[in-house]
Each structure stands twice: as structure tokens, then as C-alpha cells.
Amino acid sequence: MLHTNNTQFHPSTFLVVGVPGLEDVHVWIGFPFFAVYLTALLGNIIILFVIQTEQSLHQPMFYFLAMLAGTDLGLSTATIPKMLGIFWFNLGEIAFGACITQMYTIHICTGLESVVLTVTGIDRYIAICNPLRYSMILTNKVIAILGIVIIVRTLVFVTPFTFLILRLPFCGVRIIPHTYCEHMGLAKLACASINVIYGLIAFSVGYIDISVIGFSYVQILRAVFHLPAWDARPKALSTCGSHVCVMLAFYLPALFSFMTHRFGHNIPHYIHILLANLYVVFPPALNSVIYGVKTKQIREQVLRILNPKSFWHFDPKRIFHNNSVRQ
């Protein structure tokens, strides 16, 4: 039952209603979400394929890009298919375990993305401020250690949020006025008080990531403007263009969503929901487009693969050779 007066720690189901106030246009809302999902799916799969098959792209920067693409695939797949089920087929009912799993996956993916963007900022800092030692600093061993640190840090900060929800008793209405199982939407259905400490921790972690990225770019700008040759400055800054665009695509929707939730009390509720969707739906698609367009190595390899002449002259022995070299 979705409506009950009994207090339960683990109710059987919740009802995710979609975008409150826009139920009549759910079918039409689903089409841009579907297009965004296809873009995210195809774009990130292509990026992973290109990085895996092209030996010239086996560099730290592209390893981090592969991590980002994998994270984007997880985030978009954890959210958009269920949204489309709600928009097109009214499949809003979701089991408690599935709802918790979706919430946990969203937290994991957004946490991973934030850390990967932070590490990528450090990568750009080393590449521009200390280029001669770049390959000596970011060795394969260091990249592997950074990958482990990224995963461990995300798990350490995200897992407590899930245990907090599991400890809360739920009573009354089981309706979530959202398009996915959002943490605060679930917490508001609880009969117990919400511990704000976890929210402060999440905000602090995000602030630390942004601060590290900001410090990296301050140092990058200082190094660039100290270059003796004027024509070298735009070239140096262009290597950071993709990362800056991806960073803005990730953090700006989150900032707008937070600001409207905190201060926009007179803003219609459906605006809050749509902004929250921007935060989890659009970055995975935008990231693949941004890196595909602005990163020369990725763009050239994608065009070569999509070129019919290159396709018919595609030599599978080259991929086998690349894999043999790595082994």
C-alpha cells in the first residue's frame, strides 16, 4: 500500500510521480529526455572505444576522461530509463530496495564525477606548470593509485547517506514528488528528524573539490601569463577548454538547483524538479559532446572511424597490435 498510517522502517514501495504540475505533458517531456539519453549513451561509449583502441590516447588525461565517461554512463542509465517509464507508461511505482539502489547509484556517480573533475584539474595544472616532469609525475602507478583513491573517497562519503535513510522510519504517504529517488525527497517522508550533519558534510566535500580546482586554475593562469611568447598563451589555455566546459556543465546546474531550493520559495515546484533533472541528466550528454568537439585527438579519431573510407580500410590487426603492446 502506498497510503498507510503504520510506521515502517522498510515500506514495500514508493510512488515516484514525475514532474508535479506537468503531468499532462509528461509524454512530450519524455522525448528530449530520450534524446539526451541516446546522446549520453552513444557519445560516452564512442569515447571509451576510441581511448581503448588508440595507443596514442593512452595518456593520463585520457585515462581520466575514460573514468568520466564510465561515470556518465552509470549516472544516465540509473536515472533516465526510469524517468521514461514514468513519462510514457506511468510506471511510477518502485520497490523500496530499488529506490534506495537508485539513490545510492546517483550519489556514487555524482561523487565520482566531482572527484574525477578535481583530479583532471590537477592533471592540467601539472601539464602546464610542470610539463617537463609530467610523464615522470603521472606514471601508470600513480594513475592506478589515484583511481583507487577516487573510488574509496567516494564510497566513504556516500555510504553513510544510504545508512541514514535505512535507519529512518517511514509513515503516512509514500509519494515522492520527483522524477527519481532523490535523497531529500526520501528523507522528507520519514517520521524522524533528519540529521543535517550529513548535508553539511556533502556540502563541505563539494566545496573542497571546487576549491582544489580553483587553486589549480589560479596557478595555471599565473604560469600562462608568465610565458614569454604571447602566441603560446592561447595554445596553453586551449588545453584546459574542455575541462572548464565540463566543469561548468556539472557544477552550474547543481548550484542553480541548490539556490532555488534554498531561496526560491515562491518558485513553482516543477521548476525545482526540472532544475534537479538538469543536474543528473544533461552533464553525461554534454560531457561527451564537449570532449568530442573540443579535444582534437578524440575528434580526429571519431571522424576517422565514422569516415566510410577509413571504415572499409579498418585493419583489426592494428587493434590486436595495440593490445599486445599494452600487455
From Swiss-Prot:
Glycan-bearing residues: N5
Topological domain spans for side Cytoplasmic: 52-56, 123-144, 217-238, 294-327
InterPro entries in alphabetical order: GPCR_Rhodpsn, GPCR_Rhodpsn_7TM, Olfact_rcpt, OR51/52/56-like
Family: Belongs to the G-protein coupled receptor 1 family.
Positions of disulphide bridges: C99-C191
Membrane spanning stretches: 31-51, 57-77, 102-122, 145-165, 196-216, 239-259, 273-293
One of the Pfam families matching this protein, by short name: 7tm_4
Keywords: Cell membrane, Disulfide bond, G-protein coupled receptor, Glycoprotein, Membrane, Olfaction, Receptor, Sensory transduction, Transducer, Transmembrane, Transmembrane helix
Annotated protein name in UniProt: Olfactory receptor 52E5
Gene3D superfamilies according to UniProt: Rhodopsin 7-helix transmembrane proteins
Bilayer topology term: Multi-pass membrane protein
UniProt source species: Homo sapiens (Human)
